[in-house]
Amino acid sequence: MSLNTELELELKSRGADWVSFVDISHLSVAQTKGYRSAILIGLVLSPGYLRKVAHATDYVREMIRCKQVHVDEFHLKELQADQLADYLADYLTQKGYPAYSQSEDSIYLTGFYNEKTKSTPLPHKTIARLAGLGWIGKHNLLVTPEYGSAICLCTVLTDAPITTQEVEAPLSSQCGRCGVCQAICVDNVIKGKAWDVSTSRDGVLDVYQCTTCFKCVVHCPWTQKYIQRNCGY
């Protein structure tokens, strides 16, 4: 059994929906910490959950008011993705391979997250884009053809002898003239600009004013297609 298969089976047995093996050797050391590869772990949000959030007037604020965030599916799957990354980094290290988890706790503790700019040198969505899984939408989140933005991601950087997937070129933006996320944003932080490699995050979104209302995620037409395919309407 190859190491790729071993790791994928191990992660999927613990709840991962997909695993991608990505070459990051062409990126700067400042981004990669000198590691050659990244392992991307993905979890998908359920269609029923997304439909419930989409139909709610202000789901996130209500969950906070009722002190129910700890049982929210998105919150739980974000935690699970982080836990899987921490587990994988330990698993690889025990096998003698250098590995670094990019879980939220890890990047905070190691100073790889800049609190002032609310950024990290190598976001999960950047790795996902390099894997050919999707593009960066006008809401500054990954959009995938299959799930829209209804995903939770975490990554592990490593020098383990894995085989990385060959991607001809990252997907270009499929947002076109769509402005749904900008129109529905209650904080008016989405600027409506299509992302490309020369675009700064701040040119797309005012992250400092975003309250994470989640509306741009559930109302993205690509997320809606995923919901409709799986909810029978």
Question: Across the structure, where does each feature detected by a protein language model lie?
Answer:
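Catalytic cores of enzyme domains
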Residues: 29, 70-187, 191-233
